[in-house]
Amino acid sequence: MTYMHFLRAQMELLNDGDLAERERYAFLLRMVGQNLPGSVARDFVFEDRKGVRSRMHSVASPFTLLIFNDPECETCKEMMPKLLADPLLQREELAVLAIYPDSDTEMWKTHGTPIPERWIDACTPNGEVMHNGWYYLPAMPSLYLLDAQKRVLLKDATHDSLRQYLIGVLNRK
């Protein structure tokens, strides 16, 4: 939310003659304003490694973790082993959907990170999540935690903030 306030303030500071800069801030504000905590996350089609297509909203679980990642991303290569080793992310109350959101599906098929059997390892056909701008993904991996109704609980979370949230909600059960 702080970034949204910053963008709005920047737009107010611009004079009317700076149309290109104003449009840039307006675009960023639209992107950041998508899938806000408390809103229902944008649904999308994904395809798993077996070629089976499903909708994100059809994943039935008390909680769903979306991990938007790219096998060629250096930060993803560093972060994925930590996520894979996290026992909280193996809990049965949590469905994990590791998603490659871009269009180079051949690269995704040949460079995938070994994903636990319980997780869903998938891509979006034709990279529609990335190309349609349905999720604001300024860097990867990007973590979104959703509830059973697919409402956003955490947006672009860090691993630490995700862990803290999950410890709080999963230990209450």
Language model features: what each stretch is:
Residues 127-170:
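Thiol/disulfide oxidoreductase modules built on the thioredoxin-like
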Residues 41-42, 63-64, 140-141:
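Short loop/turn microsegments at loop-to-beta-strand junctions
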Residues 77-115, 126-133:
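Structural microenvironment flanking redox-active thiols in thiol-disulfide oxidoreductases
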Residues 55-56, 66, 74-79, 106-109, ...:
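Extended hydrophobic-aromatic, low-complexity segments
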